[in-house]
Amino acid sequence: MGLERDEILSQDLHFNEVFISLWQNRLTRYEIARVISARALQLAMGAPALIDINNLSSTDVISIAEEEFRRGVLPITIRRRLPNGKIILLSLRKS
């Protein structure tokens, strides 16, 4: 019985390592929504746009924030806490 439990724990640890390696450089839909909404709020409060908005078809703050996110010009870093206590920092700015 104890051996089966150890095998299950070993499989769970392996799954967690694979999951972390797959998602380490990708954002979840919730992180993307949070970043875009935070940037849209900044724009609505008067922050300057980081892209040229004259070429955009729509100039509402959410469209501008989405385009800034797509182009990778946002100077935002996401701190992701993992269940094992490890912290991963993800920069949204593309080099």
Curated annotation (Swiss-Prot):
Molecular-function GO term, any one: DNA binding
GO biological process: transcription by RNA polymerase I; transcription by RNA polymerase II; tRNA transcription by RNA polymerase III
Name of one Pfam family that matches: RNA_pol_Rpb6
Keywords: Cytoplasm, DNA-directed RNA polymerase, Nucleotidyltransferase, Transcription, Transferase
Localization: Cytoplasm
GO cellular component: cytoplasm; DNA-directed RNA polymerase complex
Main localisation: cytoplasm
EC class: transferase
Domain of life: Archaea
EC number(s) from the headed UniProt entry: 2.7.7.6
Gene3D superfamilies: 3.90.940.10
InterPro entries in the cross-refs: DNA-dir_RNA_polK_14-18kDa_CS, Pol_omega/Rpo6/RPB6, RPB6/omega-like_sf, Rpo6/Rpb6
Catalytic activity: RNA(n) + a ribonucleoside 5'-triphosphate = RNA(n+1) + diphosphate
Keyword Glycoprotein applies: no
Assigned protein family: Belongs to the archaeal Rpo6/eukaryotic RPB6 RNA polymerase subunit family.
Function: DNA-dependent RNA polymerase (RNAP) catalyzes the transcription of DNA into RNA using the four ribonucleoside triphosphates as substrates.
Matching PANTHER family: DNA-DIRECTED RNA POLYMERASE SUBUNIT K, DNA-DIRECTED RNA POLYMERASES I, II, AND III SUBUNIT RPABC2
Assembly and binders: Part of the 13-subunit RNA polymerase complex.
Designated name of the protein: DNA-directed RNA polymerase subunit Rpo6
